[in-house]
Swiss-Prot record:
The protein, known as: Regulator of nonsense transcripts 3A
Keyword Nucleus listed: yes
UniProt xrefs under SUPFAM superfamilies: RNA-binding domain, RBD
Region ranges (Disordered): 205-452
Organism of origin: Danio rerio (Zebrafish)
Disruption phenotype: Morpholino knockdown results in a weakly abnormal brain patterning during development that does not affect embryo viability at 5 days post-fertilization.
Cited PANTHER family: REGULATOR OF NONSENSE TRANSCRIPTS 3A (PTHR13112:SF2), UPF3 REGULATOR OF NONSENSE TRANSCRIPTS-LIKE PROTEIN (PTHR13112)
The protein's role, per its UniProt record: Involved in nonsense-mediated decay (NMD) of mRNAs containing premature stop codons by associating with the nuclear exon junction complex (EJC) and serving as link between the EJC core and NMD machinery. Recruits UPF2 at the cytoplasmic side of the nuclear envelope and the subsequent formation of an UPF1-UPF2-UPF3 surveillance complex (including UPF1 bound to release factors at the stalled ribosome) is believed to activate NMD. Binds spliced mRNA upstream of exon-exon junctions.
Any one Gene Ontology BP term: positive regulation of translation
Biased composition (Basic and acidic residues): 205-363, 376-401
Amino acid sequence: MRSEKEQRTGSRERGSVEIQFRDCQDNAAVNPKHKEEKKEIFSKVVIRRLPPSLSKDQLQEHLSPLPSFDYFEFFPADQSLYPHLFSRAYINFKNPEDIIIFRDRFDGYVFIDNKGQEYPAVVEFAPFQKVSKKKLKKKDAKAGTIEEDPEYRRFLENYSCDEEKSMANPETLLGEIEAKTRELIAKRTTPLLEYIKNKKLEKQRIREEKREERRRRELEKKRQREEEKRKRREEERQKRKEAEKQKKLSEKEIKIKLLKKCDRDDDVDSDRLKDKGDSGETEKNRWEKPGGHTKSKDSKDNRSQMENDKEQREGHGRRQRDKDHRGRDEERKRQRHHYEFDKFMRRKEETKWGKGYCQDRAKKDQHHGYSYCPETGDKLGKEDREDMGSRKERIRNKDRPAMQLYQPGARNRKRMGSGNKTFDFPPISPEHAGEHCYKTVIGTGSEKSADE
């Protein structure tokens, strides 16, 4: 297969080369003067369409043995020209007759890359027949003359002296090094640089002092906080110990407190407690008389039992007294509230009806009035209520809404009625303190007409 392709491509290329040579010969025959002037001979050949993965060494292996040449240059494929990726090579033969042999051999020669793809090569004359000349480098005149260089010899002398000094005392070497560094620094510094350096050092020192002072204050505050916490713990521990001691003492020794009996109920309770105490003492004496032979342990138990009973009785009496005191205080507050409300309503009526109305009403209350609860309010006459309503509508300010009068419950007192009758009202308990009672003045028809 490959041989047939090679024969076919070889015959085709051979014909094209013969045509080119024939054209060259014709041109030479036509222009003999021009040929004599230039005497140009084609000797540079290019091999195109080589595999992109082919290297220069591999190409030389394929082309060997090559006729004599003075120029060989290989150019790999340019990846930017994808998919037309091909390598090429330029060869300049010394003998132009070798070009035909080379063309017959490698024109149409099939190269196979590492992937198994076939690339038939093409042999042509290069479009540019000139060959780039290699630049010859000038030979350095000082090459191989380093040992004769005076600077190199001076370096060797200094190096040998340094080796001798290294064997000397290290302290002297250190002093010499410090002296050299000082000299170098003195050469590089100026008064302005020294001033700036001193300023920086001063600022750094002040900063460090402030930092130390801040750290010291923080430590002092922390120590004070720890001390306060410790003192607080000690105080709490002492209080706890004292409380425990008080508790233990109260458990061991029960203190008896005597309180005064203020009320009659308290006297009754105290008498009852005394009776119980006397009976308890009689029982104790009864049991103690024949108990001369009993143990002291029984007597201690009886004493503790009596003390507990006494404490319970005293606690009960105390609670009862506190309850009575609270009841009295509530009654006092209620009476004060009723008095203040009556005073407020009196002032309001004076401003509303006039000062004489309240005085007349007070007189009527003294001679003809009596108090009653809401159950007796229906006994008012229809005419009286209409007269009172019409009077209020005439006198009061219509821009201001009427306020419903509120009067608290009746107090424990006796009032005389118009028919020389006495109405005794029972005392109001705290449970019925919320009930509202009202006072109404009822007079005779003549008195009403006189008021109008």
